[in-house]
Design a protein with these regions (language model features):
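Nucleotide/phosphate-binding catalytic cleft detector across ATP-hydrolyzing
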Residues: 1-19, 23-208, 225-227, 236, ...
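A cytosolic small-molecule/anion-sensing beta-strand core signal
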Residues: 222
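A structural feature that tracks compact, well-ordered secondary-structure segments
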Residues: 218-219
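Glycine-rich beta-strand-to-loop/alpha-helix junction loops that act as flexible
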Residues: 81-86, 323-333
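Short, hydrophobic/amphipathic alpha-helical packing segments
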Residues: 58-65, 301, 305, 309
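Extended, folded domain segments that form the structural surfaces/walls around functional sites
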Residues: 14, 210, 303, 310, ...
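Hydrophobic, well-ordered secondary-structure elements that form the walls
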Residues: 308, 327, 375
Length: 409
């Protein structure tokens, strides 16, 4: 069994409320990712993105990681981990600094981003992301990459995402209890956007709605940058609960019924179609109309989509989402979900599946793997950025040494 250090491997760990997914990918010479191992396990001990039984979460994570390692024939030591929950918050901030040498360098960019992130933050909050939106040099606005440009002062606008420190610590503790370290904690919807969006969609304006089991995570892009993020603590598990209660069937059976037979729009289902529903307490199974099932599910999807639509309107970005909506996550796959969403949002809607991966791509060609694959894409960018910074640092040291020699001799 090879170790991650012997190969250029990245691991994504999506600790969801319903399912835990672990994916390992190998960084190839052409800067693409080849997926070499996938592991999934039913999530236990999680509720709406938070840990409510640490030991159960540890067991579930260990099972998913072991399955992934077995498939990939490798041993991993660290992961890029997702996080969600209503405790995740966002804000847009700005910072300003003078340009040191009249020409913008990477140090100037780092300084202005640091100025933007230097906002008062409660002790119980953890900074997850500082995502630059655009730069202003003197009077020139809308600059995407300011390096090399001339000016006196520079301003940066940035989107800041934070979470509850304790929530993040509990998830990290679960991962570390499995003998792994966490490279970085990433907001779930941000990771999903890396997996399912195109550059054109980001530029035109797009909203990603990641509908999982416990939470519905959202991120809005306009002009190539993130402008708004939010989490709604309601998602697919509520639909399963509705089915279980109304049809008086166990939760496990309700989940199976949802996956196999459910439809988000009752008008798309024939009145003649029937399904068999197991009963509780040893009672005989019953035959129910699939149309009746859709009548139960449709109001819940309407609630979910209307809550998401309220978030879009509250952001003030509704008119800027020209590319429409991308729904992803396990709950986005249901028949009728796209059609129903188009009715409510009055904009184009598609289901987002991971793209731009090689290797075992067929294993993850599914909306429920959006976050896990996105963690690999995010991790790749993170690694490339570190390598670029390290290379620039080495070049800077070399230049200083050369200057010293010139001065001495």
């Amino acid at each position: 069994m090879s170790k991650a250090t012997e190969r250029d491997l990245i691991v994504g760990l999506d600790i969801g409320t319903s399912v835990i997914k672990a994916i390992v990918g190998e960084l190839l010479d052409d800067d693409s990712i080849s997926i070499i191992g996938v592991g999934t396990h039913k999530s236990r001990g999680m509720d709406k993105g938070g840990v409510n039984d640490l030991n159960l979460v540890v067991q579930s994570v260990r099972q998913a990681v072991n399955e992934m390692e077995l498939m990939a024939d490798c041993s991993v030591s660290s992961v890029f981990m997702s996080i969600s929950g209503r405790h995740v918050q966002c804000q847009n901030e700005s910072g300003m600094v003078p340009i040191n040498n009249q020409e913008v360098t990477q140090d100037d960019v780092d300084n202005v981003i640091h100025a933007a992130r230097s906002v008062p933050m409660a002790a119980e909050r953890k900074l997850l992301h500082v995502l630059p939106q655009e730069f202003v040099i003197d009077v020139q606005e809308g600059i995407k990459n300011p390096i090399g440009m001339s000016g006196v002062r520079m301003e940066a606008a940035a989107h800041i995402i934070t979470c509850a420190e304790d929530m993040a610590k509990n998830l990290v503790k679960c991962v570390e209890s499995c003998g792994l370290s966490v490279d970085q904690t990433i907001f779930s919807a941000l990771a999903s956007s890396y997996a399912v969006l195109t550059d054109d969609e980001r530029e035109l304006g797009v909203c990603v709605v990641d509908i999982g089991g416990g939470t519905m995570d959202m991120v809005i892009y306009t002009d190539g940058a993130i402008r708004h993020t939010s989490v709604i603590p309601l998602a697919g598990n509520q639909i399963t609960s509705d089915i279980a209660k109304i049809f008086r069937t166990p939760m496990s059976n309700a989940e199976d019924i949802k996956i196999k037979y459910a439809c988000a729009l009752k008008d798309m289902v024939s009145m003649e179609e029937t399904i068999e529903v197991s009963s509780v307490g040893g009672r005989p199974a019953r035959v129910m109309s699939r149309h009746t099932l859709a009548e139960v599910i449709e109001p819940r999807y309407q609630e979910l989509f209307e809550l998401a639509y309220e978030q879009i309107k509250a952001s003030g970005l509704e008119e800027q989402i020209a590319a429409g909506l991308v729904i992803t996550g396990g709950t986005a796959k249901m028949e009728g979900a796209v059609e129903f969403a188009e009715e409510i949002f009055q904009m184009p809607v598609r289901v987002g599946k991971p793209h731009s991966v090689k290797g075992l791509a067929e294993y993850v060609d599914d909306a429920c793997f959006a976050t896990a694959v996105g963690l690999l894409q995010y991790g790749k960018q993170n690694i490339n950025n570190k390598r670029t910074s390290s290379k620039k640092g080495e070049e800077s040291v070399l230049k200083r040494i050369q200057s010293w020699f010139k001065g001495e001799f």
